[in-house]
Amino acid sequence: MNPPLPPRQEKFLLFTLAGIQFSHVLDFMIMMPLGPILIAEFGISTHAFGLLVAVYSFSAAASGLLGATFVDRFERRNLLLGMFALFGLATLACGLAPGYFSLLIARGFAGAFGGVMGALVHTMIGDAIPFERRAKAGSLVSAAFSVSTVAGVPVSLWLANLFNWRAPFIFIAVLVIMFAVAGWKLLPQLRHHLSAEKQRHPFAPMFNVLRDANHWRALAFSALIIFSGFTIIPYITVYSVHNIGISQHDIPLIYLAGGTATLITARLIGHWADARGKVEVYRRVAFAALLPLFVITHLTSAPLWLWVACTTLFFVLVSGRMIPAMAIITSAAQPRLRGTFMTLNATTQALAMGLATTLAGFIISQDEAGLIVDYSMVGYVAITANLVAIWFVGRIVMHKRH
């Protein structure tokens, strides 16, 4: 591990990484609320729109495999900022795309650079923050999801309605410039992982990671968590409108309430995990998440206040699992291979995300009245994956001194 940072510099590092992660998460999240606008603008089907979402995840998975061959060969800060700059250019290309296919290609590039970048953010936390504070530090960076939910979705819709669908992407590109400048000034160089011994084969770092059975267990655990969430998440909005009867105008309230709640609870869960033990806290939060996983997929009608309460509990607990889980996963890596491992983890998560969304799409259907059918079956799949993850986490060994 790199030498400990002074408290002030550690805070600068975490807030800067949180800003970079915010840009990345916001770029991914705005696609779903922009769906109706893009479908009308390009005259495409819902399936074609689904490709715009899926290409991001699968490109991130492919870039993760490629990134695993070189990520531990470079100093962390420079590689992160380089990927961040390319991500910003790809996002700007999304905003300037003249048609559907050019937007599809631009989304693929954004996913490719974003996939490596997201892994590097967690890698730098693992390299710079001691084990005893790692979950709390991770919760601060994970708060980017909550801020994106609270501010990103409403702002993206407001900009799109005020100008057009291109405005949110241009807005994110401006954010990238701001956070890239901050990163250049505030992020420390991290090169402790660099080995004096040169590895001949470009896939040597990946092979070294995959030789460790503990790494395989951590990757399987990561896939289970993502799979259990993303069988449900992509279809919550559609189910809310068509089955529960929530107005399209009230959908931002779901994200606002859920994001605000997770913004508060994320830090509390991170502190709790550092104090009581990451595995114990993960199991408790994941077990509690079984309730909203069941309710969200089985409730057939509800007033707005009750549905918002259910979805808020879903956001808090399902995303809350990720805070101790990411600390466990990061600590499972051999320190000298952490960059490669976290890149492979990002690939694993992206594949799990794409496969979960695809499987759920095969299970559910829409009847003649427009209602979503068999969403409850998707819930059972998610609950099963969550239960397996609760059992499986105990098999992962953490490197507590690094």
Question: What are these model-derived regions, one by one?
Answer:
Residues 106-147:
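Cytoplasmic helix-loop-helix junction between adjacent transmembrane helices
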Residues 2-7, 188-219:
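Juxtamembrane intracellular "pre-TM" segments in multi-pass secondary transporters
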Residues 140-187:
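Helix-loop-helix hairpin linking two adjacent transmembrane segments in secondary transporters
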Residues 279-325:
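C-terminal transmembrane helical hairpin of 12-TM major facilitator-type secondary transporters
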Residues 62-101:
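Conserved MFS/SLC helix-loop-helix module at the cytosolic interface between two early adjacent transmembrane helices
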Residues 64-75, 266-277, 364:
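Helix-to-loop junctions at the C-terminal end of transmembrane segments
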Residues 31-32, 215-255:
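Extracytoplasmic gate region of multi-pass secondary transporters
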Residues 161-173, 362-384:
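A membrane-interface helix-boundary motif in multi-pass transporters
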